């Protein structure tokens, strides 16, 4: 009862307080009406534009207005832009020394959109385009319910715009902070061993508004610690982390409005090598979900007044040409060659009906332009010792439309192309016979790399199969190769014509790669304007065109990127027969090697140049061996549509595979003593160091006996029958070649023979180390065959038994002590392998 009374008393008290407050409010209001000066309660929620944006504010007009007042930045976002996709691209503008990253390189890329939230808030979502349905379809609601995009930021609406059709939000803390949408990704921070953001040392440098984009420049400092001495760095260690305990980056974030109407998609075709994007498409009338895969390319459209000319086949200029600017930090003498590498693509665009479609230009002296601005495509020049260049692009994920590209050009790529050109052509081009090329030669090397990387930014993938469509003997035909080039595609890793012999007298035009038949055809496929907005109808038009052209010209074949088992599609190779091409290449390497002491000589050099170029010779020799190796157990893959004749998969012909095995016996397993010239090696190579020639021999032998290759040979023979190499034939050919005269084998051959027996032992009795290695390969996506219960193990045992018999016969006629010891050792190893104790 006491509790009830207490509660009742409390209720009465609360009611009195509420009524008292009401009375005060009424009294205050009455007093105000009578002229008494009383303060009104503060107004909550967004203010009007006049109340919030003062005369002190500095305003920029753009895709949305940017206001700066009282040291804060505000975005004024029109309601019409809510729900519109924008792409946010964050790049390094300046980086800490030793980071192995460079100003202009991309940090992060997100598709975002703004939307109204509850309680007067504006949300930013990151859009992940996984699936899509037409909004008029009933299933569109189910798709929307299944794929909710994450909210990555929430902003209070501080005020409404002048006409109340926009929302003003404070973005200061968002850009100063560490939100992944406009900062380093978690992966990048782990890579640099960074911890928390130091907010007191992070700030906004500037925000600039443009008609279709906003550019935000920020400085961000992260706390960091160096790894303990002797411990692994666990990433990309930055010296500043050890010196200062912090790392500072200057970043540029471009927020670019995507087109209201996406470009018409061109559906991906595996017979033409384009980068692609994709999403899952749903519709009410489907019986099977469709994965929409489409090519990545620029939008080229004729001006309305030129449309009829274009249809008649006249060359016309596109509404918006593709322009690449060269970084003003580029050494002046190389700028014309980089620009030429861009403009060289016009010959391909003419096949698609365009003139002046692509233009290389110097960076203008214009303070309104920024190298990091996402509206501009730029060749960025990096002061780096990295021997490389790369060609990325940023595209609209809805359509594949390329929006911009920042080509990465490392200063030391010149070292790479120098060594390539010298080791591949010095036998035939006197200009290649020195460690420092003249500017014209180096400029033309830069031009070829520029064209290759620009090709990537246009959407083109590597075509490693292109060079296989040139017969080897045509590479020595001066008239033909100077007119057509040694490969049909500059997107191949065909480098230079190493097949050409001195007596062929082929000039540089027959040694350098160029934009070829395939490149022109691929650009024609990707950039011909059909005017067709229906992707399926566009595909029908292009499919017939592809079939007709491939039937007429086999040089248009796209062979992929060398990641399968097709020997026609390899990196760094030439011609339609790897054995013949490599024999010519080795002839030239022999000519080059004997001249290296003279060609590498420079004042004060302590044989570093000779050592470097000897390594390049061995490396090139090793590449030739790898080209031949791919033929053994090779499977040809030629993508086709149902309208084309023939199979997609076929074995590498038996005769070619046997030729490869014979090549190894002649060029590799018979010790290549020409690479062991003591007069050269004694200048720089200590004999106790690892022998590079032996390393090449061992690597190829182990690859020939790799369980995955042997298993592939068995499955190919099962599928293709007599047209494929049989496993027992391959193993017999290898054993007979390797042990042709065991009693006279030199130390290199003896080491190889021991390796052979050890590899077969490993097939029969796999160790835990090899099994763990196989498991690791599977874990990272590489297939690894389980051969324990297959013919591979049976054949390995059979080969050891055959070898044991032949060794016993050789032993009877062997008198050399080293050879006898070797034979006895092999017999012991075989016995242990066949009957492990």
Predicted regions and their residues:
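Solvent-exposed, acidic/flexible segments
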Residues: 331-338, 439-447, 484, 614, ...
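Conserved catalytic/binding loops enriched for acidic/polar residues
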Residues: 467-837
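The catalytic-center signature of Zn2+-dependent metalloproteases
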Residues: 37, 44, 362-382, 444-501
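Auxiliary tRNA-acceptor-end handling modules of aminoacyl-tRNA synthetases
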Residues: 22-330, 348, 357, 363-414, ...
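Extended catalytic-interface subdomain
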Residues: 390, 395, 401-409, 450-458, ...
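Solvent-exposed, polar/charged alpha-helical surfaces in well-ordered, non-transmembrane soluble domains
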Residues: 336-343, 347, 448, 619, ...
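Sec-exported extracytoplasmic/periplasmic mature domains
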Residues: 343-354, 455-456, 460, 496, ...
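Bacterial Sec-dependent N-terminal signal peptides
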Residues: 1-24
């Amino acid at each position: 009862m006491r509790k009830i009374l207490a509660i009742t008393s409390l209720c009465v008290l609360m009611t009195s307080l509420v009524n008292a407050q009401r009375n005060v409010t009424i009294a205050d209001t009455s007093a105000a009406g009578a002229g008494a000066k009383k303060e009104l309660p503060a107004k909550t929620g967004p203010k009007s534009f006049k109340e919030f944006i003062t005369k002190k504010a500095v305003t920029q007009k753009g895709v949305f207005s940017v206001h700066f007042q009282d040291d804060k930045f505000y975005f004024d976002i029109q309601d019409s832009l809510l729900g519109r996709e924008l792409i946010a691209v964050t790049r390094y503008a300046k980086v800490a020394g030793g980071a192995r990253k460079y100003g202009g390189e991309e940090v992060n890329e997100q598709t975002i959109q703004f939307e109204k939230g509850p309680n007067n808030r504006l949300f930013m979502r990151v859009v992940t385009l996984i699936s899509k349905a037409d909004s008029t379809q009933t299933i569109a609601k189910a798709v929307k319910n299944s794929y909710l995009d994450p909210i990555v930021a929430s902003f209070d609406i501080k005020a409404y715009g002048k006409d109340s059709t926009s929302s003003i939000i404070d973005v200061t803390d968002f850009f100063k902070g560490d939100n992944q949408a406009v900062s380093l990704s978690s992966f990048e921070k782990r890579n640099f061993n960074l911890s928390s953001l130091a907010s007191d040392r992070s700030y906004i440098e500037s925000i600039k508004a443009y008609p279709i984009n906003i550019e935000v420049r920020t400085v961000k400092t992260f706390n960091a610690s160096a790894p303990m001495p002797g411990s692994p760095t666990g990433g990309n260690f930055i010296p500043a982390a050890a010196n200062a305990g912090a790392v500072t980056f200057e970043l540029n974030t471009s927020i670019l409005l995507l087109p209201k109407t996406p470009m018409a998609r061109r559906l991906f075709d595996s017979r033409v090598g384009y980068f692609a994007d994709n999403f899952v498409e749903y519709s009410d009338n489907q019986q099977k979900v469709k994965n929409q895969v489409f090519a990545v390319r620029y939008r080229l459209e004729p001006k309305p007044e030129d449309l009829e000319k274009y249809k008649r086949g006249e060359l016309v200029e596109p509404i918006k040409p593709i322009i690449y600017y060269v970084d003003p930090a580029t050494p002046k003498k190389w700028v014309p060659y980089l620009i030429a590498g861009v403009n060289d693509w016009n010959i391909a665009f003419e096949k698609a009906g365009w003139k002046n479609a692509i233009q290389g230009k110097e960076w203008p002296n214009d303070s309104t332009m920024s190298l990091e601005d996402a509206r501009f495509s730029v060749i960025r020049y990096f002061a780096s010792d990295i021997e490389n260049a790369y060609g990325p692009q940023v595209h609209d994920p809805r359509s594949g439309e390329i929006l911009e590209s920042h080509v990465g050009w490392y200063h030391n790529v010149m070292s790479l192309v120098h060594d390539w050109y010298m080791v591949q052509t010095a036998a035939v081009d006197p200009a290649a016979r020195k460690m420092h090329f003249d500017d014209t030669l180096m400029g033309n090397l830069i031009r070829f790399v520029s064209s290759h990387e620009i090709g990537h930014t246009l959407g083109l993938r590597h075509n490693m199969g292109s060079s296989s469509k040139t017969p080897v003997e045509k590479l020595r035909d001066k008239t033909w190769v100077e007119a057509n080039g040694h490969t049909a595609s500059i997107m191949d890793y065909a480098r230079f014509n190493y097949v050409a012999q001195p007596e062929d007298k082929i000039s540089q035009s027959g040694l350098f790669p160029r934009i070829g038949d395939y490149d022109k055809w691929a650009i024609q496929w990707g950039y011909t304007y059909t005017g067709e907005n229906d992707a399926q109808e566009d595909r029908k038009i292009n499919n017939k065109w592809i079939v007709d052209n491939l039937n007429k010209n086999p040089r248009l074949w796209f062979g992929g990127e060398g990641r399968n088992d097709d020997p026609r599609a390899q990196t760094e190779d030439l011609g339609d027969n790897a054995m013949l091409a490599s024999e010519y290449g080795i002839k030239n390497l022999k000519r080059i090697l004997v001249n290296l002491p003279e060609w590498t000589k420079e004042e004060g050099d302590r044989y570093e140049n000779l050592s470097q170029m000897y390594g390049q010779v061995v490396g090139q020799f090793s590449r030739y061996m790898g080209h031949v190796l791919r033929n053994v157990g090779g499977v040809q893959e030629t993508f086709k549509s149902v309208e084309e004749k023939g199979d997609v998969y076929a074995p590498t012909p038996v005769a070619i595979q046997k030729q490869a095995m014979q090549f190894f016996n002649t060029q590799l397993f018979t010790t290549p003593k020409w690479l062991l010239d003591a007069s050269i090696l004694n200048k720089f190579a200590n004999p106790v160091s690892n022998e590079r020639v032996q390393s090449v021999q061992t690597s190829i032998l182990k690859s020939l006996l790799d369980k995955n290759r042997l298993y592939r040979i068995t499955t190919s023979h099962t599928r293709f029958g007599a047209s494929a190499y049989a496993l027992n034939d391959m193993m017999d050919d290898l054993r007979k070649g390797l042990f042709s005269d065991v009693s006279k084998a030199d130390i290199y051959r003896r080491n190889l023979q021991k390796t052979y027996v050890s590899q077969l032992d490993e097939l029969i009795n796999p160790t835990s180390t090899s099994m763990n290695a196989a498991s690791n390969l599977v874990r990272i996506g590489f297939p690894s065959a389980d051969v324990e219960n297959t013919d591979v193990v049976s054949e390995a045992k059979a080969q050891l038994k055959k070898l044991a018999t032949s060794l016993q016969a050789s032993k009877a006629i062997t008198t050399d002590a080293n050879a006898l010891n070797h034979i006895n050792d092999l017999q012991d190893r075989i016995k242990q392998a066949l009957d492990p104790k």
